[in-house]
Amino acid sequence: PQFKLDSGELLENVEIAYTTEGKLSESRDNAILVFHALTGSHMLAGSYQQLDNPDIPWNEELETGWWDGFVGPNKIIDTNRYFVVCANYLGGCYGSTGPSSINNSSNEKYGYDFPSVSFKDIEISQKLLLDYLNVKSLEAVIGPSIGGLMALEFCTIYPEYVNKLISISSGYKLSTLQTLHNLEQAYILDLGRESNNRNNEYLSLARMVAHKTYISLELLSNRAKSETLYDDDLIKGFLSTPQESYMMHQGEKFIERFTPESYLSIIKGWQNFKIEQEDLNKLKDIETLVISVDSDVCFYPDEQKDFLAVLNNHEINTKYTTINSTKGHDSFLLEPELFEDTLKNFL
């Protein structure tokens, strides 16, 4: 169907790739919507094969759902109780309409000409998906990382539709550091457009800029192998340490499973994200949980404390907890056991 974007532009033949886990109750009110992180996907839990997904970029990281440790029968988000929905973002590269889709006016892929998509566009498209799935109301909306920003804004758009909000390693606005990191990555990707088919190398570099905020320095040091993998002639005078090799490897793995055009589309939406503080008053009837990770250097703990203070100023019913982890921002992907009690008790 046709979809009108925040910008006023129209997208034709919009498709949203999604997965569901569990069963919708007869009262249609046991659903949980999960917004994924920047480079995540709708493939939330369980196992996946490239043969079943021939039209999307792929590597072995996609063979297991990105939140498989959290979602499933008798897991933290128990699919014996809940109907869990996760959708790939509009503008993404995992099956939803995005830069890899065909532009009807040219019969070619949109590429970098794909229209600007706001986070609000993504949220509205996912509400349309929930309507299609016949979901009457949501027991919870959950979002880690930038998914937490979308989960929050979703609740301000549809406050009567949501019972609970869970924001994990996220916040309510961009920090100065995030704004600058996004600019750096966008500039790198823009250079890649004019680089004679080297745009994947530029995507790899953009990923390295971001990746160092996803893990703690301690984890980076522990993960880096003792031997180096690269000839130091590649970048003269560099790549002699395992930490450098580790970051190069992360960038190279990433370009197997993502596209520069979708990466730029989503960080552009992030860069232009803004919630007016008065809109937070709409959360009055929504129970809210804010989870911080003490070693997070993407969304720093101080940002969650600021978020909590703003919610308290608006008299929003909010619980707050800090996870103690050495793994940084990516703790929400790697350590379900640390989140288990908090999430189960809140749900």
What does each model-identified segment do?
Residues 109, 113, 120-140:
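Conserved acidic catalytic loop of the alpha/beta-hydrolase fold
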Residues 161-162, 166-253:
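Alpha/beta-hydrolase-fold enzymes
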Residues 290-292:
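Short beta-strand/loop motif that positions the catalytic acidic residue
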Residues 297-303:
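Conserved alpha/beta-hydrolase "acid-adjacent" motif
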Residues 305-308, 312-347:
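Catalytic active-site module of serine/aspartate enzymes centered on a nucleophile-bearing elbow/loop
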